[in-house]
Amino acid sequence: MSELEKAMVALIDVFHQYSGREGDKHKLKKSELKELINNELSHFLEEIKEQEVVDKVMETLDEDGDGECDFQEFMAFVAMVTTACHEFFEHE
């Protein structure tokens, strides 16, 4: 398996490690999203402590307005963070 394919499998696995703990296994609730960000993105993003921050992140990601983050919305978030990191490291 190529490095890109391994990364794709890892993204799917991480999403499903957190989704469905509290309901729909194909979507992240706010608490699941907060836990995922704090556990899996701690080197790129600050720890989320305030509920308002979680609410704002979810509002930004939740394109269909259902109050949860599906895999497509999660991938859009990963792409945004990855792009920001790439731009940051590109200038170093």
UniProtKB/Swiss-Prot annotation:
An MF annotation (GO) of this entry: protein homodimerization activity
Cellular component annotations (GO), alphabetically ordered: ciliary basal body; cytoplasm; cytosol; extracellular region; extracellular space; neuronal cell body; nucleoplasm; nucleus
Record's keyword annotation contains Secreted: yes
Protein's GO biological process: adaptive thermogenesis; astrocyte differentiation; cell adhesion; cellular response to hypoxia; energy reserve metabolic process; intracellular calcium ion homeostasis; learning or memory; long-term synaptic potentiation
Binding-site list for Ca(2+) 2: 62, 64, 66, 68, 73
InterPro entries: EF-hand-dom_pair (IPR011992), EF_Hand_1_Ca_BS (IPR018247), EF_hand_dom (IPR002048), S100-B (IPR028481), S100/CaBP7/8-like_CS (IPR001751), S100_Ca-bd_sub (IPR013787)
Keyword Oxidoreductase in annotation: no
Domain EF-hand: start-end pairs: 13-48, 49-84
Organism superkingdom: Eukaryota
Sequence positions that bind Ca(2+) 1: 19, 22, 24
Modified positions (N-acetylserine) in chain numbering: 2
Binding residues annotated for Zn(2+), in chain numbering: 16, 26, 86, 91
Entry keyword set: Acetylation, Calcium, Cell adhesion, Cytoplasm, Metal-binding, Nucleus, Repeat, Secreted, Zinc
Membrane spanning stretches: none
Subunit structure: Dimer of either two alpha chains, or two beta chains, or one alpha and one beta chain. The S100B dimer binds two molecules of STK38. Interacts with CACYBP in a calcium-dependent manner. Interacts with ATAD3A; this interaction probably occurs in the cytosol prior to ATAD3A mitochondrial targeting. Interacts with S100A6. The S100B dimer interacts with two molecules of CAPZA1. Interacts with AGER. Interacts with PPP5C (via TPR repeats); the interaction is calcium-dependent and modulates PPP5C activity. Interacts with TPPP; this interaction inhibits TPPP dimerization.
Free-text function comment from the UniProt entry: Small zinc- and- and calcium-binding protein that is highly expressed in astrocytes and constitutes one of the most abundant soluble proteins in brain. Weakly binds calcium but binds zinc very tightly-distinct binding sites with different affinities exist for both ions on each monomer. Physiological concentrations of potassium ion antagonize the binding of both divalent cations, especially affecting high-affinity calcium-binding sites. Acts as a neurotrophic factor that promotes astrocytosis and axonal proliferation.
Protein name: Protein S100-B
Native source species: Mus musculus
